[in-house]
Each structure stands twice: as C-alpha cells, then as structure tokens.
Amino acid sequence: MGAGEERPEALGFNPQKEIVYNLLLPYAHRLDRESNELLAQIKGSLGRAVRLRELWPGVLFWTRKLTTYIRLYGRKFSKEDHVLFVKLLYELVTIPKLEISMMQGFARLLISLLKKKELLSREDLQLPWRPLYEMLERILYSKTEHLGLNWFPNSVEGVLKTLVKACRPYFPDDATAEMLQEWLPLMCPFDVTMQKAISYLELFLPTSLPPDLHCKGFRLWFDEFLTLWVSVQNLPQWEGHLVNLFARLANDNIGYIDWDPYVPKIFTRILRSLNLPVGSNQVLVPRQLANAYDIGHAVIWITALMGGPSKTVQKHLTGLFNSITSFYHPSNNGRWLTKLMKLLQRLPCCIIRRLHRERYKKPSWLTPVPESHRLTDQDVTDFVESIMQPVLLAMFSKTGSLEAAQALQNLALMRPELVIPPVLEKTYPALETLTEPHQLTATLSCVIGVARSLVSGGRWFPEGPTHMLPLLMRALPGVDPNDFSKCMITFQFIATFSTLVPLVDCSSLLQERNDLSEVERELCSATAEFEDFVLQFMDRCFALIESSALEQTREETETEKMTHLESLVELGLSSTFSTILTQCSKEIFKVALEKVFNFAVSNIFETRVSGRMVADLCRAAVKCCPVESLKLFLPHCCNVISHLTINDDVMNDEELDKELLWKLQLLSEITRVDGEKLLPYKEQLVQILHRTLHFTCKQGYTLSCNLLHHLLRSSTLIYPTEYCSVPGGFDKPLSDYFPIKDWGKPGDLWNLNIKWHVPSAEEMDFAYYLLDTFLRPELQKLDLYSSGELEMSRDEVQQCLAIVHNCLTGSGNLLPPLHGERVTHLVTSMVSLNETKLFTGIDHDHSRENYRELISKTLRKLLHYILDHSEDDTKSLFLIIKIISDLLQFQGSHKHEFDSRWKSFTLVKKSMENRLHGKKRHIRALLIDRVMLQHELRTLTVEGCEYKKVHQDMLRDLLRLSTSSYGQVRNKAQQAFFTALGTYNFCCRDLIPLVLEFLRPERQDVTQQQFKGALYCLLGNHGGVCLANLHDWECIVQTWPAMISSGLSKAMSLEKPSIVRLFDDLAEKIHRQYETIGLDFSVPEKCIEIAILLQHAASTSSQLPHPEELALAIKRQGEKNVEAVQNYERLVNTLLDCVTQRNLPWKFEHIGIGFLSLLLRDDYVLPVRAIRYLVQCLNHDALIVRKMAISTVAGILKQLKRTHVKETICPYKISGCPKPESKLVGDRPDNQWLLYDSSNLPNTKEAWESCCFVEKTHWGYSSWPQNMLVYAPADQQPKVGRSREEMSEAEQIIYDHFTDEKFVDQLIKFLSLEDRKGKDKFNPRRFCLFKGLFRNYDDAFLPIIKPHLERLVADSHESTQRCAAEIVAGLIRGSKHWTFEKVENLWNFLCELLRTALSNITVETYSDWGTCIATSCESRDPRKLHWLFELLLESPVSGEGGSFVDACRLYVLQGGLAQQEWRVPELLHRLLMCLEPKLTQVYKNVRERIGSVLTYIFMIDVSLPNTAPTKSPHISDFTGRILGKLKPLMDADEEIQNHVMEENGVGEQDERTQAIKLMKTILKWIMASAGRSFCTGVTEQMQLLPLLFKIAPVENDTNYDELKRDAKTCLSLMSQGLLLPVQVPLVLDVLRQTARSSSWHARYTVLTYIQTMVFYNLFIFIHNEESVQGVRWLILQLMEDEQLEVREMAATTLSGLLQCNFLTMDAAMQAHFEALCKTRLPKKRKRESGMVGDTIPSGDLVKRHAGVLGLSACILSSPYDVPTWMPQLLMDLSVHLNDPQPIEMTVKKTLSNFRRTHHDNWQEHKQQFTDDQLIVLTDLLVSPCYYA
C-alpha cells in the first residue's frame, strides 16, 4: 500500500480496509477527522440504543448510519471495533421474535461487515451456527406460513442464505460434527427430508478450516457423501446441492484431497448434465431439467482439480471440449446452448481467479495452495489450447458474442500469443466484408476484450502492438450512418484503443536513436499515421453528422427531440472524439482543432440534432486544451452574436435567425470547461447574457439559460480537468520521453496526480456576481407578480422560472442547504437522531445571500398565487415542481445521472480489467473517474436528513400539486413527492393524515381529481416508499381503514375504470409487500453485554446511560409491546367496523376481508369479533369472499390448536437391540419395530395405547437423532371430547356454527359447486379447514357431516366427489390424536364410504381421490392407518367394474403406499404377489398403471453406500421370475410381431402370446422407472436387452403398435443410463451377442444404442482401454454387414465417435479402410450375365463399400475444419465416383455434405489443399455427376 505506513498515526488506529479513492480527493486531509467523529458517534449511539432496548427508531437508525459509513469510507475501523460490530449484529439478527423487516436490515449489514473474509481470521472471531439454523428453520421451513399466519418477503431466502455463507468461515471447530449429528438422521433418500438435509449441509458445512483441523472438518463426511453421489442416478434434486458442496470443498482445499479416482465420473456427470441431444433417433429422458448441475459450481469444481502432479483433469477437460465442440458451431441452436456458453465464459474466469490467488493475492489467514499443486505455466498453456477452438466458434453464436468476448479477455491475459492471432485472423476479413455486418460486430467486440493484452505486448506477445494501427485504420468505415449497431461498436472499438495508447507521432526518433528494438522501430514508423487517422476519423464523423441533420431525417412537424438512437450515437461520437483528443500530441491536436473549428464556423446547423453533435465535438476540443481553443472559439461566437443582436427588435422576434441560434448553442457548450480559463472572457460573456437572456423566442432564451447554467457550474463545481492516460500528458520533448513505453500502461493509484478544479475566490465572486445580476431581478419580478402588483404574461412567468431553475441547478453546491427548526413530536426516542454533515469541498459563505432560502420563499408565494388564480398554467407549474425538487435535493449532481455513470464505469471497468494481477491496475482515466464518483457519492448522501419546517411546507405544497386538477401536473408532483418522502426521517407520519383527509367519506368538497391524486400518493412509485403499507402499526391503523371507508366517499365512482384499477393496484401492492409486523420488541441480555463493550470502545463516554434511564428503558420496552398489541386489536376492530358499514360497495368489502386475512399471526389469536365475522363469511354470497374465508378460518383453527406433549424415547430400548457398531442405513434390527406387521396390529385399546407411534416416515432410516421425540401417552395430552363450557370464547364461536345443521348444509352446498369447469383440483385450503375442525374438536361435528359425506360419495359428479375427497382427507389427518374408540368408529364408517367412492370413481375424479389418500398417509405411522391399507389391498386388480376402475384403484393405492416409503415392506410384498399373475393384463391403461406401481414397489431397493439389503421386494428376484416367463420369446428367431388384440380371447392361450402380453407390461415398468428411481437395476435389466433389440423397429413410424414403440423408447432411455465401471463389460457382451443376431433390425439398433451410451458415459468408457477397443471392434465388424442400412448406420456411428474424440483416426484404421477400398470387384460383364433377379451383393462389393464408408465417416467427422489428413482422403474417395451402387451414392452424399459444411469458411480451408488437389476437388464438387 502506497499510503499504508502513516495511517495509524493519522487515525489513532490501524484501519481494516478503507476506500483508497478517498485519499485522492482534493479535500482528503479533512476526511480523517470527519470519519473518526462519525465512527465514535455510531459506536456510542448504537451501543446506547441497544442498552436502552430501543430497537426502533434507535438501533435501526444507527445501523443504517453504519451502512452509510461503510459505503462512504469502507471498513475504516480497527479490528477490535470490527469484531464488536459483527458480534452485536449477530446477536441482533438472531433475536427470536425480531420483526422480519428489521431482521433483513441487520442481516444485510452483517453480510457487508463479513464480506471480506481475509480481514478477520478464525482467531479473531467465532460465531455459533445453531442460532442461524434455528432462524432458517423458523422462516424457510415455516410451519405456519402456508396457512397465512406469517408473511415473509420473497427476498428473505436469498438474504438468509447469503448470511450463512458469510458467517460460515467462523463456525467453531466442532461445528461439523454437531451438524452431522443434527442432519444425518434426516437423510432418507425417498423422503423430502433428504433434500432438506443436503441443502442444509451444503449451506452450513465449513470447508475452509486449516489443514490441522481437517480431521474435524470434511474428513468426517467426505467419503460417505462422495460414495453416495457416485451411486445415485437420474439427478434427484439434492444431487445438485452435493455438487455445489464438493465444488466449494475442492476450491477451499486445493492440494489436500486426492480427487483423481473420481475424475472420469465427475466429467461424465457434468457432460450428462448438459442435456445435449445425441444419437440418430433419441428420446430424451424426461428428467426435470431444473435439476441439472449449476454450471457455475461445476466450473469451480473443475478449476480446483486442475494442476498438481497428475494431469488427468486437463486430459479430461480436453476430452470434454473435443466431444462438445461441434455443438458450438453457429449453425447449431437449442435450449442447451446457454449452458454451453456459460461454461465457456466461466471457465477462463475461474482459472484467472485461481491464478490470481496463487500468484498475486496478498496472503491472508486462509490456507494457501501448496507449491506442489499450483498451476504451472505449462498447465495454463494446455488449458488455453484446449478451450480455444470452441471459443472461436462461439464468437459468431446465435446468442451473441458476449460470452466469447469475456472468455477471450481472460484467456488473453494468460496466453496472448495463443489467443490473439486467431482472433485477428477472423477480424481482418470481417473488416473487409460488406455482406456480413454481424461478423464485424462480433469480431470487434472480441478484439475490444483483448485490447489491453494486445497493446501492451509484453514478453509473450511482443508483436501485438504492431496490429493496432492497421486495425484502427480498417475500422474507420464502420462509422456508417446507415447501420446503427456497427456505428456504436466501431466507436467503442476506437475509443478503447485510443484510451490505451498515446497518439504521438514518434517517427522522428528513427533517425535520432539507435537503441530501439525491431518492434519498437516498426511502431515508431507506424505512428506517423496517427495524424492521418485522426483526420480521417473526423471526416467520417462530419459525414455522419451531415446525414443525421434534422431536415434530412424527418418532417418539420415531427418530434423536436432527438430519438433514442440518435442520442446514443451522439454520446458515442462525443465520447470517442473526446478520448482521441485527450490522447493526442499537441501537434495533432492543433490540426484537429483547426479542422473542427472550420467545420463549425463555416456551416450553420439546426440546434436539435446535428447542432448538438457538432457542439459536442467542439466542447470536447475545448475541454482538452482550454486556453488555445477558447482563444479560437469564444471571441468568434461572441462577435457574431453581438453583431446579430445589435438591433433591439431581435428581442421580440418569435423566430430567431438560424445562425444566431447556432452560435448561441455553440457558445453555451464550449463554456463547459475549466472555470478558471473562462475568467479572462467574463465581461464578454456577461454582455452576451444581457443581450440574450430575455429573448421572446423560447428556443433562444433556453440556449442562453444553458450558457448561464454552464458558466455557473464551470466556476463552482469540483472536478478533474484532464483524463490523459499518463499523468502530466504527452507534451514533453521526445528526447526525454518515449511514448511507446506507455502503450497500454495502467494508471498507478499512488501517483495519479489528478489535476482538480477547485473553485478559487475569484471564481466564487464571479458566480455570485452572475446570481446577483441575473437571478435577483427575476425573483423580484416574481415576488411583485405574486403580490398582484405587476402584470406578467404566462410566457414571461415561464421565462423567469426557467432562469431561476438554471441558476439554482448551476450553483447547487455553492448554496448552503435550507435551514430551520426541526419538526418534533413525530417519534419519541431516548437516543440522538442527528443527521450527519459531510464536507464536500466547499465551505459555505454564510455572509452572502443564501439564494436557496430566497428562491424557496418567493416560489411558495408564487405557487399559491398561480393555484388560486390561474391553475391551468400547467407549464409554469411543471417548472415550479422541478425547482421545488431541486431546492430539496440538489447539491451539485442528480441521483439518476450518478447511477448511470456508476453503471457505465462498471461496464468499462469490466471490459478492460485485468483480473489476473488485480490490485486496481486500471487505466488512469478510469481511476480518475472512480475518484470523481466517490466525490459525487458524498454529495448525494442525503438520506436520513432531518425533517425541518421548511421541508414540511414544501412537501405540503407538493401534496397540494399531487392532488391538483391536471393529470400531468399531478404525475410530475407525485414523483417529486415520493423522492422527498424517502429523504427525510419520519416525514411519512406527518403526511399520512393529510393524504387521508381526501378520502374521508364525510367530506363533501373533494373532487374526483383530488381523490385520485390522494390514492396515487398512497400507492407510491416502483421501488419507493409506499405510504399505504409502511411497516408500522401507527401508520397502518390509519391507512387501511381509510381506504375501505373511502368506498362511501362522494368522489368515489365505481364507473370510472381508472379508479377501480387504482384500488386493485393498491390492494395488490399491499398483499405483495406486506410483511408480518412485530408485536414483541424485547432485546435479550446477550445483545446488551456486547453493547456495553461497544460503548466503552467509543472515545466519547458522555452518552453512557444513567441507571434511572436504564430502568425507564425497561419500562418503555414493556409499554411499547403493550401499545403494539393495542394497535393491532384497534386495527382489526376498525377494519371490521368499516367492512360492516351499510351501503359499502362490495369491492371494498372484499378488499377489507383481504386486509383482515393479512392480519392473522402465529403469536396472537385474532380477536373474537373477527373470528365470528370470518366464520360467517364461509357462507358469503361472493365466491371470492368464501375462498378468502376458507383460508383464514383454517389459519384461525391453527391458532386455536392446543399443543401436544412430546417425550423422549430410546429406540434401542424399544427394539431391544444394541446400537450398531458401524454405520448402517436402511432396514436394521433397531428400526424393525417401526415397520407394518399385520400379525401385530394395534387393533385393541390396550395395544393402541401401548404402541409407540412414530409419525414422520424418515426417522430411523439413516440413523436415530440425538433426541428422539414422540407424542406422550393420551392421558398427558389435551382433553378430547370437551363440552361447550370447557372451550374458550373463540372456540365456542366455531363450535356453534359447525353444530348448526343449516350452516353446514349451506357450506357443503357451496363447496360442492364447481368453480372452473375441468380446471378444478383437490383444494389443499379446504382440506386444511376440515383437518383443523376435526383436530381441534375431535369428532364433535362427525354426526352432522356423516350424512353429507354419504350423499356426496354416492353422487358421481366431479365437484361433489372432490368435495368428499377433501373432507375425508381432513377427517383422516384430523383424527391423529383421537382415542382408540373414536378412531375405530371413524374407520368403520370410512371403510364403507371409501368402498362406495372407489366404485364410483371417474376419469375426472381419480386424481383427487389419489391426492386424498396420499395426503392422508403422508407422515403418518402406517400402523395407525392399518384399516385403510387393508381396505386398499383387498383386491387391487379384480376386474370388477372394468379395467378403468382397476387402474384407478391401483392409482389410489400407489398414492398411499408411496408416502409410506420403506415402512411397509409386508404390504409391498403382498401387492407384488397380487400383481404378478396380473402382469399379462390386456388393457393398456391397467398395464401403464401396473408399470408405475412396480416402480414404487422397487423404489426402496437401492444400492446406496452402507445400505442394508431391504426387506421390501428386490428387483433381481422379480426380473429372474420374469425372464423365465419370457423364455419363449428369447428362443424364437424371427422378429416378434404383436398379434394380441385388446380383448381377452376365450380359452387358454399359448405361452408365446402370454409372453408378449407380459412383455408389454414390463416395458411400461422400465419406462416408468427410467426417470424416477435413483439407481437403475442395470445388471438385471441388461438381460432384457437382447429381447428389446429384437422388438424395436428401425424407422420412426407412428403406425407401429404399442409394443414396438415402447421397446424403442425403452432402448433409448436405457442407453442414456449412467453406467458404473463394473457394468461396462456386461453391456458390451450383450451388444456383441446381439450383433450376431439374424435380424438386421437388431444389428442396426445396436449401433444407435452405442451412440447414445458412449456419449452419456464418455469418460467412464475412455478410462478403460479395453472397452474402447470393444466398441471399435463392434463398429468395424458391423461396417462390413451384408445389410446396406446397417453398414450406413455403422459409418454414421463411427463418424460421431471420431468427432467426439472417443476413437481416433490412427494409421491402422486408415490402412484398414484403404485396403478394403482396394477390394477387386467382379468384371461388369460377368455381373450382367448373371440372373436378373440376383440382387444380393457379392461379398467383395460389401467389403469395398465398407472401405468407402470408412473414408467418408472420417471426412464427415470434421465438419468445421480441414485436418492434415483430409485432402488425401478426399482424393482417395474421388476414385470411387464411378463404382457401382451403393458405392457411388455414398461418395456423392459425402462430397455434397463436405461442400455444405465447409462452404462458410472456404477461403480459410482452401489453404490446406495443394493446387492439383484443388483442381480435382473443384471438378468433383461441380461435376455433372453432382447434379445427376
């Protein structure tokens, strides 16, 4: 650090990490005192606020101040303070009952405190993990959110996860072991808890522990998780999380883990997860696409594995790119493309990050990468070489060249000599082409990315800089008025290169110096062209300007403003020109200045488009060298203007002379320069202002106002005056300065030598003189006018206001902010809430007139006058609104301009940064820009300002304007109003009552416009404050009821669509943004302990609280909580009063009920009156109200739920087994007691009560939790069967309604109506309602509901059946805690009911009954539901009621059993026994269902690590039995035809027919399980392969019967399966055996199978040389097959495998094919003399054809380039053009394909051929035979 040494003395502490740019500000010397005062204030006040337990406003106010402090100064505090801040915020964030919006605020601050983890080591800080886990559990897995008892914002998940990531490095050493204990018991792979466990582990597990703690860290879980990952398949959702965890682990511990054994698997998985389409006829597995790996993490993982002694990773990476390169070709497009592009962009970026960390980063406490595993130069070279080809292809991708450009930028930092030449090779031709402009934009954007590497040359690529001038000269034609995008990229290109290079002509040095290198001499002579380049560029710009003049581009009547495109071109033009002139030598500048001056003076431009552009160019010139340029321009303009205004009549002209306007415009732009240089001309300028400021012509006086505005800004602002790429510029003699050394040189942060413009006393005087001369008279005029003492026309008033506005915005930072007294009584606080004053470079001179005060006084008077006398003068009102908002906000820069400058700064920084070396090595201009932005940031830091009386007056004026009669005035005023609301502390509380005044129904005098305006003020703008929904009881208590009551206002009219829409928007916004507001604001003691430390760390001890204050604080905290509850109840009651008013329009009643539903909470029961009202709403006439009521009453029932007692058990005691020694998952002796056992069911009261029920299905599968909780026995639970007297008032209300038959009748009637035909589904809200009723009141309502249920079930209508299903599910779930007698009675009734229901099931309702049963069984002990399971298993497939009922019963049964997962093996066995005889079912729908049920039966049979063999059915036994039955098909030779019709024939059928029927069902099973199960039972299913090959057809034909179609799908799905290395030989055996089959269909299908299988398991195969050879042998053998189709497919397969580099075209293979080609054919005569019918090809012809096919496969395997061996192969092929068919056809096809694929880049490809070869080739490609 250049300034690192002296900081501790200056500050009194060693700062953690400050923002260095602050040290470069012109007033840097004053900042240390300022920041120290602010820091002391923050520490003192924040500590005090916490000790006084005042979360709001105190703590919130001061944490915001800390956030601002970090934004302004960085982490400019000592390490001790840093730790205290972190600890305090950690305690605050984890307060259990903290309001959610506060929690998010604290969390964001804590994240930014922990963001730079190198600043605090594990020694400095430890944070516990459990409070964070409890918070995530409470919020992300909230039990009450879905019932509407908690409202969390959408952002909360992201914030919490980021918070955990930030705290993770500081978890204690034992955290890993504790986390595993907590979450491993959840790891049951069939359950959703698996996803939860893995995502928690991914989020929390610390991976950056130091090496000596690895045994306490990842070593505890690494092997177990990795083997788990290796053995799963089909991407279950949690697999992605594991990958993210491994990626992070690998990245944090490079060199400490040996990943080599897993590399082939890792790459195979990554390749699979790209979901690329492969193979000749493929059906992609319907995997959930969202489950693919996150490319970002996959890339981090790959990067972390690179380097080190073994080079396997680079080898695999090269393999990966070889296999996917062709997908990058621009002609390919698909949804997979975005992933591929992201891969390209991220990889180089990650490698750069890693290189930076290993070679350049400052060492910190984080473990460094060991020397042995760092990336060597050779590693880097290999990497760059492997990725170059895809990147070059991606340059022209359909999705644009952005990713390629970013990749090239990073690659060029590593190896410019490998990267830049190929890019240039593509760029030069693109610059010449006229027909393909997209090539130009793509290549230029890529060259911009590599510009810095190109220009700086360096040891790797010294010849780089020589390309710069040729590129610049060739790019000039891109400045083309007819092609906008080309124009913009060219400007960017030229600007980028000019910024990097001083444009100085050094050619004279060639004579003087002889110590120059070859490249330097070449560059010196080239620089002679700079001048030429600049002049040519200017000519191009002038042409562009002339063609875009207003007269040329549109009619006079059209818009006067520039179009969006024009303004972009204007910006590009002026910034590029300004960059070029900044970088010019004096000599070149003079020539350019002369040229631009002549152009500007010799023409007259219109002032709207071309005039603006020319004035911009002139301004750019003047800015670079103010003295010389002003001498040229200023007197000229002044003279012309004076001359043209000699005659006083000009003042009153409506239209001014074109030349006068143009010169005025030019003058107003060239005065935007260093204010000091304007002083010599001040008299002339003032004279011009006198002459022009009061033109009658608006265009004239506007330009004159601009001049005044710019003069004021130039004199009073602080800004840098030059942006040259080298400090001090290039104006030095060449003898002492050699510019070429500075090509591409970065700025040096510690020697920037910024030249600042700081206003001098003389300039200040000039500014005040201007204000006194021009502003004061206007204000006096307006003052007289608004007193009625002076007549003025509207135009004159507008002119006055325009001058006032320009004076105000010109001198914004000169005028001190408005003063006055504070508005008190808005909030009470025991902590000071003072605003912070920042020094921004100017000491305000209070002895002079403060014009800001004066303007505000005059304007308010004027505003009231206009509103009272001429409200329709909207143009004046617009100006007044602008002035008010600038009076309030403006201190020299506007927020939106600053934001867009910050954005463009970031863009430029990104496009030219060097991430490899880091350390802010940006170009000097960019660094200066950043310092300037830092200064502007300080001027804009205004939030948290005190709310003073002056502000109050102006805000009230804005509110009056926001409710005025004119829509446009309202709109503009509202925007200003919203901005101001966000600026002043607590002002909303002052304004809400004033806004609501307009909505009061009693008022008779409110107009519709005022009503609308007030509603808009409540609604707020996008992203700003929304008054209607402040997170504060006191505000909501006022706003919500007022909105409802406004429905009775006279101004309200439901006929007006705009008003209806406003209410809709308001309601929608409140629902979207509402977050639960806190009722408990207590501060725990833990926070207070840290606050005391923090206060003592503050240097000022004056604020330490007094003991009396502390006592008062505790009292205040209690009062605040009571007050919150009172406000809450008041709000609910007021809303009820509003909603029940007579005559209230229905719309408002609905909105009101919506508001009530937001007020449900989980920590406070809704007031009784509201409960009564909402229960009555269940039978409201309006459907929308009934829907809301159903949800709300379900929530109320949850609030009224009584808690059930739990107790801890020891599972080992219950099972009587000891704890297992080693880790074992699945069916173990100690969890057998959990399983369903029909011989030991709890079907008596004693058995029921002694049975230990475990409801959650995942417990016990993986391991038992530390503390296993189950429900305590019934006698300890809340009483069941209470009488009405024993209930609370709230419970009685619900009880009374649901025991009232009429009420229930009506409710059921409503519930069984249909809502949207055919769209309705089982409704979980209604289910929750019934579940709540039966849970809270056990069977009290059963007698009333029973008859309804019986009626509903008997009716087969869709809506009635659905209603029954919802109630039944609610009953079964609600009966969880009933006593045995009640449950038994319930089931006696339900069994009958369900039997009826299942026999009445229909197409529309079967999925609802499925949902009903699945919902009833989820997370329930199966032994509790034994009645249900026995019922469902009575006769799953009986044939009664037809095939449809069977299919439905199976569906319902599957729903129930699937929820039970591993706990019902007995039932699964019983079901399988039932189904096996039925597998030959004839009906398709039953077969499909059986297939699906089988998948679930075998789901539990998984081969995961440490898993015991399951008690549930095993796939292998089942497949064995099936294969026996399929034997008749296996043995048969001929192709299998499906001749079984869909009805059952009479009598016994032969074995073969039975086997075909069986096969059909088995196919359905394989299809269903392909996408679902974790592990395909590969070894077993492999044995079915030969049969599938036999059945599957070759062509795609929709007429094929089901059997063939399914067989084809199964093959496709199986070929995509993930193979374990042991399985590869098995599969190859099956394929070999099939390749000998007599059916050519089977042989053909083997090939398509190989294509997909190899690609989807690429690295597993490549890893094993034997299997590669096996595949190769198979293909070569099939290439000589007697069937033509098989040969051709073998060739296609070969070509594909060559293309993805699985096989290589080695000499042996080439020789093999060439030999086959030379096979002699029988003489033609002999052939003809044979029989006419003799079409079987002779063996010789087959062999020769095989050879030709082999050669053609090689040619087609390189579709996008010409390798060295290709020309010769093409020649070999051409010999066979006249061979007999099918050889001739093959040759033709190959040649036409070659021509098609190589046509695009033929110029480049031509180079590979000799002249002779080219002649032959040209003949071939256009020979007559080509068209024959």
Swiss-Prot record:
Gene Ontology MF: a single term: lysine-acetylated histone binding
Q: Where is this region: Bromodomain-like (BRDL)?
A: 1635-1723
Biological process according to GO: DNA damage response; DNA repair; proteasomal ubiquitin-independent protein catabolic process; sperm DNA condensation
Q: Which UniProt keywords apply?
A: Cytoplasm, DNA damage, DNA repair, Nucleus, Proteasome, Repeat
Each HEAT repeat occupies one of these ranges, namely: 462-506, 985-1024, 1164-1202, 1339-1377, 1621-1659, 1665-1703
What is the predominant subcellular site recorded for this chain? cytoplasm
Going by the entry's taxonomy, the superkingdom of the source organism is recorded as Eukaryota
Identify one Gene Ontology CC term for this UniProt entry.
spermatoproteasome complex
Look up the signal peptide feature and give its range: none
Q: Does the keyword Ion transport apply?
A: no
Q: Does the keyword Zinc apply?
A: no
User: Where is the protein found, in the record's own terms?
Assistant: Cytoplasm, Cytosol; Nucleus; Nucleus speckle
Q: How does it assemble?
A: Homodimer. Interacts with the 20S and 26S proteasomes.
Entry's family note: Belongs to the BLM10 family.
Instruction: Tell what the record comments on domains.
Output: The bromodomain-like (BRDL) region specifically recognizes and binds acetylated histones.
Q: What does this protein do?
A: Associated component of the proteasome that specifically recognizes acetylated histones and promotes ATP- and ubiquitin-independent degradation of core histones during DNA damage response. Recognizes and binds acetylated histones via its bromodomain-like (BRDL) region and activates the proteasome by opening the gated channel for substrate entry. Binds to the core proteasome via its C-terminus, which occupies the same binding sites as the proteasomal ATPases, opening the closed structure of the proteasome via an active gating mechanism.
What name goes with this protein?
Answer: Proteasome activator complex subunit 4
What species is this protein from?
A: Xenopus laevis (African clawed frog)
Q: Which gene encodes it?
A: psme4
